[in-house]
Amino acid sequence: MKKIFTLLLLSSFTLVSEAQIIKTSLTLTVRDELGNTVEGATVMLFENDADYASEKNAVAEGITDKKGVIKFKDIKSVSFLVIARKGDKDNSGGGEQIGKLEANKFNKATIVIQ
């Protein structure tokens, strides 16, 4: 009976640890040329140059919140090309690519639009 209880106890820890695995995520903060956060900026992520150039087939997209932040959850652990835009400002000319994301981690980056 003691062995069965021990086995059940150990297997329950295994189930809990598998359920707590962190999925790869990316938190982007969009700032203007003065360093202020930008609310309402449109952000798109692309995996390849062709899609980035044509602005089609974004793997994820959204709009920044009032703190200039957007979160992408459960995404691939790859390098992304980014377009961030609000009005006549965007990130072209710099900061267009994010290095490979670390798998099963909370990744962060800042994009500057001007």
Question: Where do the PLM segments sit?
Answer:
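Glycine-centered loop-to-beta-strand initiation motif
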Residues: 64-72
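A short, solvent-exposed beta-strand micro-motif common in secreted/extracellular proteins
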Residues: 76-89
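Structural motif
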Residues: 28-39
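Short amphipathic beta-strand segments in non-cytosolic proteins
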Residues: 42-62
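Sec/Tat signal peptide C-region and signal peptidase I cleavage site
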Residues: 13-19
